[in-house]
Regions:
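N-terminal, active-site-proximal structural segment of metallo-dependent hydrolase catalytic domains
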Residues: 1-50, 62-65, 154
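Active-site-proximal beta-strand elements of phosphoester/diester hydrolases
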Residues: 1-10, 101-116, 147, 250
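Structured beta-strand-rich core segments of catalytic domains in phosphoester-bond hydrolases
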Residues: 35-38, 42-114
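Metal-dependent phosphoesterases centered on the DNase I-like endonuclease/exonuclease/phosphatase
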Residues: 50, 126-219
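Conserved beta strand-loop-helix elements of the APE1-like EEP
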Residues: 61-76, 198, 210-231, 257
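Active-site beta-strand termini and strand-to-loop segments that position acidic
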Residues: 70-71, 93-99, 225-226, 248, ...
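Surface-exposed cleft-lining segments at the edges of enzyme active sites
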Residues: 81, 109-127, 163-167
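Surface polyanion/phosphate-binding segment centered on an Asp-His-Pro turn
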Residues: 236-258
């Protein structure tokens, strides 16, 4: 089974790229972030034409997440955590895979910049709420796959120039501690189980020739609860999509399960 995750930075602008990706890579699930559209304007019919259904938690012009799928799903939840700002950042579905009930969660974590504003405090509050949710899931021994744009650079090997990012909301010590806390509570960073090498990024700024110079960040992740991390067969970054005309500034990450 293949699950991909991609911050598309506008589903309407990137629709042709999405359709081609689905046809080429044939994931069973595609988790989208920053779709930047309301549900009524989501391209359901175009996706249906190539064999995919969609569950969408949209928002006008900002944020928004979706799960595109060609397998049976159950128990759709459009608000995994309580968000007092009512931003569209989470969606989850349950699936059966190899006789296991697994919850797939698509997340778009707040960016948090600038750090001296309410945006950073919102990110902290959001992460605390998400962590509380995961602790509860762990107590219930749930099997979880979390995929999405976490807006967190986990380690210095996940950013081209760590010194430049020390006070950024994606890399501050406080933020990285949240990521480690989640891992310590019973989750694995799927990519790092497979690939220990530095300079593997999922995001490159549109400016300064960042992609060509590989000045990027690894901020898009798959986290799996340890009770199913043995199913991980491979995790790759589909960087070729970043070379297309009018690309997203993120590349998809692809999780293959045995």
């Amino acid at each position: 089974m293949i699950i991909s995750s991609w911050n598309v930075n506008s589903v309407r602008v990137r629709l042709n790229h999405i359709l081609e990706y689905l046809k080429k890579k044939k994931p069973n699930f595609l988790l989208l972030q920053e779709i930047k559209t309301e549900n009524k304007n989501f391209p359901y019919s175009e996706l249906k034409e190539i064999g995919y259904d969609s569950e969408v938690h949209g928002q006008k012009s900002y944020n928004g997440v979706a799960i595109i799928y060609n397998k049976k799903i159950n128990n759709i939840n459009f608000n995994v955590i309580n968000d007092d700002q009512e931003q569209s950042r989470t969606i989850s579905v349950d699936i059966n895979y190899q006789n296991e009930l697994i919850k797939i969660i698509c997340v778009y974590v707040p960016n948090g910049n600038p750090v001296d504003t309410d945006k950073y405090q919102y990110k902290i509050k959001w992460l605390k709420s998400f962590d509380k949710f995961l602790i509860n899931q762990n107590k219930l021994k749930k099997k979880i796959i979390i995929g999405g744009d976490f807006n967190i650079i986990p380690n210095e090997t996940d950013v081209y120039n760590p010194e430049d990012w020390e006070n950024d909301a994606l890399y501050r010590v406080e933020i990285r501690k949240f990521f480690r806390k989640i891992l310590n509570e019973g989750y694995d960073d799927a990519f790092r189980l497979i690939n220990k090498e530095p300079n593997n990024y999922t995001f490159w700024d549109y400016q300064y020739g960042s992609f060509e110079k590989n000045k990027g960040l690894r901020i898009d992740h798959f986290l799996l609860s340890k009770n199913i991390s043995h199913l991980i067969k491979d995790v790759t970054i589909d960087k070729y999509l970043r070379t297309l005309e009018r690309p997203s500034d993120h590349a998809p990450i692809k999780l293959t399960l045995a």
